[in-house]
Amino acid sequence: MCTGLRFTDDQGNLYFGRNLDVGQDYGEGVIITPRNYPLPYKFLDNTTTKKAVIGMGIVVDGYPSYFDCFNEDGLGIAGLNFPHFAKFSDGPIDGKINLASYEIMLWVTQNFTKVSDVKEALKNVNLVNEAINSSFAVAPLHWIISDKDEAIIVEVSKQYGMKVFDDKLGVLTNSPDFNWHLTNLGNYTGLDPHDATAQSWNGQKVAPWGVGTGSLGLPGDSIPADRFVKAAYLNVNYPTVKGEKANVAKFFNILKSVAMIKGSVVNKLGSDEYTVYTACYSAATKTYYCNFENDFELKTYKLDDETMNADKLITY
């Protein structure tokens, strides 16, 4: 499972990140990929990185396999679980930009600074069902990609092939597909952050008992559909705040409200599904903020001249 979130502040600065909700941790950590680091591809020519990247992931055979990452220009991407729907190509297609599905993270962050350019380039992309190596399965993912101006959702499904959606809500969770989630929001148009008022029912005064009545019916469980509704509702209605400290707090307040608490969800294997980490990237200061289920202290990591020009991967 997972929840992705993005918004901009009153100055147009981007805050973008996610919850990672899984049944285990993978030994993930913050990784900085510097400029001029070797970047192999399965179907394209190998190259080196042009832009420094920061995010959370694991290193596999020297390759930074990111769960979410952000380049030095402020473009970010996060991959979220998309089970039962994701279906990638069985092999490369002539005339297409063929990428193993895991390669899209660094392909996007290395080649683009704006979502509008990513959207155009994706028209010629073929995502191939190819794992990073024989020890890993292909993850059934969809992606949210964002800069300070807009966000898109990229899905490759059995039914529709590749689809790219504009994400005006700044939210993504898991299956079903993004268009289904947008349709489902129609069930919640009666929600309002303002409290309900007293009414007269055939002469009988009926009054609310306390605050929060306008949002009565807002979901609070952990299924993807309900996390989508709640995160979208909070993202739309959270007041604008000023300054990085307040906006990072806003970000974590929203995502922690849809976090999966250990013990509340047990999967069919008998394992707890829970929010392993929450992360937020501030594009203005090139700062990656994160905390973990077992360590709530907010940690910060930065892209700066030293880290962006390092001679090897930096892992924390």
Curated annotation (Swiss-Prot):
Q: Where does deoxycholate bind?
A: 2, 18
**Pathway where it operates:** Lipid metabolism; bile acid biosynthesis
The enzyme's E.C. designation: 3.5.1.-, 3.5.1.74, 3.5.1.24
Q: Where does taurine bind?
A: 81
**Keywords assigned:** Hydrolase, Lipid metabolism
Q: What induces it?
A: Constitutively expressed. Exposure to TCA and TDCA has little effect on the gene transcription.
Cross-referenced Pfam families, in alphabetical order?
CBAH (PF02275)
Recorded catalytic reaction(s): these are:
cholate + taurine = taurocholate + H2O; taurochenodeoxycholate + H2O = chenodeoxycholate + taurine; taurodeoxycholate + H2O = deoxycholate + taurine; glycocholate + H2O = cholate + glycine
Record-given protein name: Conjugated bile acid hydrolase
Name its species. Answer: Lactobacillus gasseri (strain ATCC 33323 / DSM 20243 / BCRC 14619 / CIP 102991 / JCM 1131 / KCTC 3163 / NCIMB 11718 / NCTC 13722 / AM63)
